[in-house]
Amino acid sequence: LMEEVLRLEHTGVLGKPFFISALKEQVMKIQARALGESGLPETEDNVSLEGLRFLAAEDNEINAEILTEILSIEGASCVIAENGKQVLERFKESEEGEFDAILMDVQMPVMNGYDATRAIRTLARGDAGRIPIIAMTANAFAEDEKEALSAGMNVHLAKPIDVGMLKQVIREYVLIKNHAE
């Protein structure tokens, strides 16, 4: 029986009170470290974002600057929109495939992230239904994650964003998808 048990030598840390999304993030990190190399393009620890292009919805100027700087350091570029309506318009104006993913805040003026995601998913263009949309929000309860997924977002990340977790999500939803195509 002991031979059949996968021993997880790595641990994660959660503070109290903790949210389901934070628990899920820690479990995913532990699993990724325990399973190691899976034959996919790169591992979580050395994911390269070099050359990736992101469209990001972020109404907080400081958060937008931090996100842009993080992505720039990783070799990626980012176009910032201040609300959901601007993201929708910028995506409509873009060439198909211009962006590798959309990083979507949820609480924004003019149009929220849920409505923007629903609108993007209904556009009559080939990439509208398949571009990864990653929720990046302070809304960290299980019902917030459920609402993000039902709006058409691929995954929900709670703020403050952990760079390692963001890279893992990008690996899973952007790099592996591109590798498979």
Predicted features along the sequence, with ranges:
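C-terminal compact regulatory domains
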Residues: L1-E181
